[in-house]
Amino acid sequence: MFAPILETLDSWDYPYIFLTSDSADPALTHHKQSKFIGTGNRAYAYLNGLSADVVVMTTPGLDVLQIKRARGVGHYCHIVHSLASPNYRVFGLDYYDSVLVNSVMQEEFIRQVERAHGVKRKEIFITGSTYCDALCARKERIVAQEGREIFASREGRKAVLLSPSWGKEGLLSKFGMRLIEAVLSTGHLLIIRPHPQSLISESLLIEDLRARTEGMEAVRWDIGTPNVHAMSQSDVMISDFSGIIFDYLCLYEKPVLTIDFDFDHAGYDSADIGELWEFGIFGEIGKRVREEDFGRLGEIIAKLTDGGGNQEAISRVRELLWTHARDSGVQSARAILGLRERVLGERLGRLKGYSDEILKIREVLA
């Protein structure tokens, strides 16, 4: 997520400190200015005592959940980690000062939520998707180096990737074995890749479904591996509203079949605005079906994968979503340094020593 930004700052020889709660984070070995801050309450305590001009985080809920606005921080910036709308739990972005987004659609979503909640208008910078850029750079290398085949033999069958979101509105919670059996009845292969949070919050559900599909020749559970394996080796995706839909579309330009149901917006920011823009384009990039269509999945999948998909629409949506493709690290770093320049400028009346830092930033941004 942060790798393209850190690599850009390193190339500019500009100092920063990267903090992580993942003891296995690659940045701890690849970037010298990195620190492991622990997990849980230990990490929250560290973050709540920060002193910095600008703090950039992917975690929503500032001043709502455990992470509070530290007195020593001049500016809080959120970076969106998905190509979809940043539809977090309610108030997820309300108290950030700025946001780095991927597209105009994400910007408009945030503006709608601001108006609905009556909160201060944030600065928004369209800087592209660092996540998508990093994944794009790694995908071919990962697949080539590991050479892992999910299915040893396909025998002419299509591979369907079931990749849902997590929670009560996710496909596995909503439909479970009914959907799995419907896909298998088509005669195709099925790769099930649950959302990582499902393994924590819905562990009993996942354990039950894995037990019920154990030994099925046409089923593979893809857990704990880079998602590019499943995406590259599948022909079509089935999902709900997960952001991985757009990863699949942007990286592989393959069709997506989405299950249409009455989404419960309670507890999410989207409860206070109109329909999410994603739901308006799902029909363009593949096919939208309801539970009563499960018996027709074979016919629908065949049409999508045998030239019946709208490739023109997929390419158009890809262009809208993936702005600044492969340049998000530079765009994001410039926005962050611009924010720091302003924070330092506001302090100049009291602390003249910051002027050298401002001059260095201007030199880098020139």
Task: State where each predicted segment sits.
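Catalytic donor nucleotide-activated moiety binding site of glycosyltransferases and closely related
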Residues: I17-K32, S185-W221
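Redox-cofactor binding/interface segments in oxidoreductases and associated redox assembly factors
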Residues: V56-M57, H78, V101, L162, ...
